[in-house]
A protein has these predicted regions:
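Charge-dense, helix-prone N-terminal extensions
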Residues: 1-111
Length: 111
């Protein structure tokens, strides 16, 4: 998978926009990041739950690894682009997008 392939999947999510922070592209829904492309041009990140992350690490250990530190422990998952396939990334990206949408609904219920 290429950076453009990753970008295309991210932007196919309803309401997704491309923005940037810390010098690299990110993808947002409801103002919240659900995926990013890393500076190294070799990897991206999808924001999964820890449980979802474990599923993807178990099913596709060559494609997905936890991000470093607390981000990884919270579910942020690195996608190794040259090992990734469109179907698996699409599934992970959809979950990351849904997580962002669900978190937005929870925030709205609290206000």
């Amino acid at each position: 998978m290429t950076e453009n392939g990753f970008r295309k999947i991210a932007l196919s999510m309803q309401g997704a926009i491309e923005s940037a922070h810390m010098g690299h592209p990110d993808f947002r829904a409801n103002g919240k990041i659900f995926a990013t492309l890393h500076d190294d041009k070799k990897s991206g990140m999808v924001k999964l739950t820890p449980e979802q992350q474990q599923d993807f690490l178990g099913e596709h250990p060559e494609m997905f690894v936890p991000e470093n530190g607390a981000w990884g422990r919270s579910g942020c998952t690195r996608v190794i682009l040259n090992k990734a396939d469109e179907e698996a990334v699409g599934e992970a990206m959809t979950l990351a997008w849904q997580n962002t949408k669900n978190n937005a609904k929870k925030r709205n219920l609290k206000t």
